[in-house]
Amino acid sequence: MKVQITNSRTEEILKVQANNENDEVSKATPGEVEESLRLIGDLKFFLATAPVNWQENQIIRRYYLNSGQGFVSCVFWNNLYYITGTDIVKCCLYRMQKFGREVVQKKKFEEGIFSDLRNLKCGIDATLEQPKSEFLSFLFRNMCLKTQKKQKVFFWFSVAHDKLFADALERDLKRESLNQPSTTKPVNEPALSFSYDSSSDKPLYDQLLQHLDSRRPSSTTKSDNSPPKLESENFKDNELVTVTNQPLLGVGLMDDDAPESPSQINDFIPQKLIIEPNTLELNGLTEETPHDLPKNTAKGRDEEDFPLDYFPVSVEYPTEENAFDPFPPQAFTPAAPSMPISYDNVNERDSMPVNSLLNRYPYQLSVAPTFPVPPSSSRQHFMTNRDFYSSNNNKEKLVSPSDPTSYMKYDEPVMDFDESRPNENCTNAKSHNSGQQTKQHQLYSNNFQQSYPNGMVPGYYPKMPYNPMGGDPLLDQAFYGADDFFFPPEGCDNNMLYPQTATSWNVLPPQAMQPAPTYVGRPYTPNYRSTPGSAMFPYMQSSNSMQWNTAVSPYSSRAPSTTAKNYPPSTFYSQNINQYPRRRTVGMKSSQGNVPTGNKQSVGKSAKISKPLHIKTSAYQKQYKINLETKARPSAGDEDSAHPDKNKEISMPTPDSNTLVVQSEEGGAHSLEVDTNRRSDKNLPDAT
C-alpha cells in the first residue's frame, strides 16, 4: 500500500497492487491447489460420517478446521445428533477460503447463510432451545455457540452443506456480474479461473464440480517420476478428467482429448491392483494357508485411513487379568498369614501392605466358628436373584482342611422325613437347596489366599477368637455389615450386651464431657426424685428427707439444679458438701475459728479433705457446743486486760450494788443496772 503526501494532506491509495497480487496468485503451484481440494474432501467426509462408531458414553466429536475457525462439533444429545448454526457458518467459510475466495464482508456473509437456515423448520429439521437451557449451556462450554440466547439447534442429517455453500457462492457471482459489491472475492485458484454461466441448463453446483475436476493437476503427473496422490472418491466420473484447461462447455467435446483419457484410466488400474491384494488371495490365486490371511490383509490395509472403530479393553488386552500370578493356595495354619476378604467398595486409603500384622492368632480354627459376611457389605445391592444364583452355580467349590464346610455336611440332614416319598421333584429340590447352601457358604468364607496385583490388602483386622464367656460373638467380628444381623428375643439379652455403667466403657464418649441438658429423659415418678442421687439408689425418696429437694418432674420447665450443695454424695455427682469458710472472730481463740454463718456456704480450699457424713458433727450439735462455751467464758477483767480495745464490757455484781446481767441472743453481754443507793457514776461504770 502506497501513501502519497499532497498539500499537507495524506491520501491513501487503495488497490494499487491488485494486478501484481493477481499475477502472484495465478502462479500458485499445483500442489497447493491439490491440498486445498483434499481438505475440502476431508471436511465433506467428516460431515457425512461423524455420527458413526461412537463410544458408549461419548457426547461430542470434533473436527479441526484451522486456527481461525477452530473446531466443528457433532453433538449427541437425547439420542439425536445436532449441529449448531455457528458451526454451519464455519463450514461455509472454510470451504469458501479453500475454494480460493476471501470473505470481505463476514457479517453480511453470515446473514445470508442464516437466512437460508430459516427454511429448516422447528420440530422437523431443528429444535428450538430456550435461553440458557442445559443443552445450550453444554454447547456454549464446548465453544459451539457464541451466545446462549433463544435459538435453533439443527439436526445433523437435515443440513445440506453443499447446497448452502453453492447458494452463497451463487449470490456473490450474481453480484459480481451486476457490478455490485459482493461478500467474497477471488484471490486464488480454482476460484480465479471459474466462470459462472447463468444461461446454462446445469445448476451452479454441477458446474462447480466439473470445474474442480478440471483444475486437478493431472496433466503434470506425466513429467513427474512419483505417482500422483489422488483419492479414488474424486474420480467417480472418468469422463470429466481432462488434460488441458479448456472452456467450461468444451469439456468432453474435443476429439484431441479422447485418446488421453483412457491413458489416465490405465494409469490408475495398476494402483488398484496393488492397493487391494485381498481379491487375489480370496480368489485362490495364491496357495497359502488360511491362518496367514489375516496377516496379509493387515499388511494390505491403507495406513492413511484413520479407523473409526473403538475396541474395549477386553478385546485389545484379553490376558490383562492373568498378568499377575496369584499367591499359592495354602491351608489355614496358626503361622500362615490371613488376608482379609476383598470387598467391592474397598478404598485405597483403607488398604495396607502385607506385613507381619496379618499373622493369625495361635489357636485352632476348628474351635472358632466362621461367621459369613452379609451380602449387603460384600456385593452390590442391585444384583438380582437370578444373577446371584447363577454366579454361585458357576463357581467351583474349594476344599480346605481347616474350612468349616469340610466337616459341616449340609447334604446329610439329621432327620429326613422325605425319604419315604418316592417323588423326584422333592429330591431334586432338596439336592438343589443343599448344593446352593454349601456354595453360598463357600462364597463368603473362602479361606484361600487371593491375589492382589498392587501388593495391598484391605486394612481390616483379622478375625477375633470366639470366647463363650465374653460378650456377643457378632459384636466381636471385625467386618462391616453387623447391623444386618438382628438379635433374637430368646437368644440373648440386649441389656447385658450393652451395659450402661461407666466401668464398661472402653473410651469415654464425648457426650460425657458436655454439661447436662435441661431436659432429662427419664420417666416421671411423683414419689421419687428425678435427679439421680447415687449409683446404687438413682432415685431417692423425698418424704423422710428434710435436707434434700422435693420431687420435680423432668418434663417441667424448671429442671433440677445440678450445682446444689445439698445433694447426697454419689459416684456420678461429686459435690463439696458441708464446706464452710474460715472466718476469724475477734477476741476468740484459734480453736473457735470455724463458726457457721447461717445458710451461706462457699467452696473450701482444694487441699481440704471433708470428713464422711457419718463422722461429721451436725449443725445442731455445733450450735449447742458454742452456746456452752459462751457461758463458760472467763471474767470481763481478764478480757479487758487481754484485749484493751474491745468495746464490749460486762459489769460484775458487788455487795454494795444490785445489778442484773442479761445475756442476749447475739452472744453480746447487755446488763441493766438498778442502784438503790444512787451511787455516783465515778465509782462504777454503767452497763452498756
UniProtKB/Swiss-Prot annotation:
<dbReference type="GO" id="GO:2000220">
    <property type="term" value="P:regulation of pseudohyphal growth"/>
</dbReference>
<feature type="modified residue" description="Phosphoserine">
    <location>
        <position position="400"/>
    </location>
</feature>
<comment type="function">
    <text>Binds to the DNA sequence mediating pheromone induction (called the pheromone response element = PRE) which is found in the upstream control region of several a-, alpha- and haploid-specific genes. Involved in mating of haploids and in pseudohyphae formation in diploids.</text>
</comment>
<feature type="modified residue" description="Phosphothreonine">
    <location>
        <position position="289"/>
    </location>
</feature>
<dbReference type="GO" id="GO:1990527">
    <property type="term" value="C:Tec1p-Ste12p-Dig1p complex"/>
</dbReference>
<keyword id="KW-0010">Activator</keyword>
<dbReference type="GO" id="GO:0005634">
    <property type="term" value="C:nucleus"/>
</dbReference>
<dbReference type="GO" id="GO:0000122">
    <property type="term" value="P:negative regulation of transcription by RNA polymerase II"/>
</dbReference>
<keyword id="KW-0589">Pheromone response</keyword>
<feature type="region of interest" description="Disordered">
    <location>
        <begin position="587"/>
        <end position="610"/>
    </location>
</feature>
<dbReference type="GO" id="GO:0019953">
    <property type="term" value="P:sexual reproduction"/>
</dbReference>
<feature type="compositionally biased region" description="Basic and acidic residues">
    <location>
        <begin position="230"/>
        <end position="239"/>
    </location>
</feature>
<dbReference type="GO" id="GO:0007124">
    <property type="term" value="P:pseudohyphal growth"/>
</dbReference>
<dbReference type="GO" id="GO:0001403">
    <property type="term" value="P:invasive growth in response to glucose limitation"/>
</dbReference>
<keyword id="KW-0539">Nucleus</keyword>
<dbReference type="InterPro" id="IPR003120">
    <property type="entry name" value="Ste12"/>
</dbReference>
<dbReference type="GO" id="GO:0005654">
    <property type="term" value="C:nucleoplasm"/>
</dbReference>
<protein>
    <recommendedName>
        <fullName>Protein STE12</fullName>
    </recommendedName>
</protein>
<keyword id="KW-0805">Transcription regulation</keyword>
<feature type="modified residue" description="Phosphoserine">
    <location>
        <position position="226"/>
    </location>
</feature>
<feature type="region of interest" description="Disordered">
    <location>
        <begin position="211"/>
        <end position="239"/>
    </location>
</feature>
<dbReference type="GO" id="GO:0003677">
    <property type="term" value="F:DNA binding"/>
</dbReference>
<dbReference type="GO" id="GO:0071444">
    <property type="term" value="P:cellular response to pheromone"/>
</dbReference>
<feature type="compositionally biased region" description="Basic and acidic residues">
    <location>
        <begin position="288"/>
        <end position="302"/>
    </location>
</feature>
<keyword id="KW-0597">Phosphoprotein</keyword>
<comment type="subunit">
    <text>Interacts with mating-type protein ALPHA1.</text>
</comment>
<feature type="compositionally biased region" description="Polar residues">
    <location>
        <begin position="217"/>
        <end position="226"/>
    </location>
</feature>
<feature type="compositionally biased region" description="Basic and acidic residues">
    <location>
        <begin position="672"/>
        <end position="688"/>
    </location>
</feature>
<feature type="compositionally biased region" description="Basic and acidic residues">
    <location>
        <begin position="640"/>
        <end position="649"/>
    </location>
</feature>
<feature type="modified residue" description="Phosphothreonine">
    <location>
        <position position="29"/>
    </location>
</feature>
<dbReference type="GO" id="GO:0000747">
    <property type="term" value="P:conjugation with cellular fusion"/>
</dbReference>
<comment type="similarity">
    <text>Belongs to the STE12 transcription factor family.</text>
</comment>
<feature type="modified residue" description="Phosphoserine">
    <location>
        <position position="214"/>
    </location>
</feature>
<feature type="region of interest" description="Disordered">
    <location>
        <begin position="285"/>
        <end position="305"/>
    </location>
</feature>
<dbReference type="GO" id="GO:1990526">
    <property type="term" value="C:Ste12p-Dig1p-Dig2p complex"/>
</dbReference>
<dbReference type="InterPro" id="IPR052127">
    <property type="entry name" value="STE12_transcription_factor"/>
</dbReference>
<keyword id="KW-0804">Transcription</keyword>
<dbReference type="GO" id="GO:0045894">
    <property type="term" value="P:negative regulation of mating-type specific transcription, DNA-templated"/>
</dbReference>
<feature type="region of interest" description="Disordered">
    <location>
        <begin position="630"/>
        <end position="688"/>
    </location>
</feature>
<feature type="DNA-binding region">
    <location>
        <begin position="57"/>
        <end position="167"/>
    </location>
</feature>
<keyword id="KW-0238">DNA-binding</keyword>
<dbReference type="Pfam" id="PF02200">
    <property type="entry name" value="STE"/>
</dbReference>
